[in-house]
Amino acid sequence: MRPLHPIDLIFLSLEKRQQPMHVGGLFLFQIPDNAPATFIQELVRDIRTSKSIPIPPFNNYLNGLFWDEDQQFDLDHHFRHIALPKPGRIRELLTYISQEHSALIDRAKPLWTCHIIEGIEGNRFAMYFKIHHAMVDGIAGMRLVEKSLSHDPHGKSIVPPWCVEGPRAKRLKAPKVSRIKGVLSTLKGQLESTPRVIYELSQTVLKDMGRNPD
């Protein structure tokens, strides 16, 4: 298990229906001209049947004040494949993204979802990735997604974004004793820094309220 960082705890505490605390990225792709009609179906199948194993933070869920490994990880809950209604314009795409992005992520599961969206005009498809800010910040999350992509349009090797090893996953591969020491050390540091973090955050909020009185 890994303790929640105080700032992550604040993000979770402040979240409400009208104020979601997740971030999202939308990637738009062109289907190759010579691709078969089953291109998207094959892509989705390859992702779902990938032998790569989900790694932290993508296989972690909230367990009290800790992140814990989800022993019953269900890929179908997180990875979704949909087709836009015709005519499949950017308008329909953004309507779908707006609806999905407004929904809070289920806290009983790892806090992310990924959508492959086909049926976009111009022979295109999209990937929409949503992840909670408490799990990973937006920039780091998008970097992990980009690592799973290839510059080679003919590349067949697929590593799903949730299987890409980032710095956090490497830290968690340390021996168990080292990880326990790391958790205790991290928890001690976080408890010591909590008052300062809360003070700095409150000052930022007050400044924003001063700039935006409404």
Predicted regions and their residues:
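M16 family metallopeptidases and their MPP-like homologs
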Residues: 7-14, 21-29
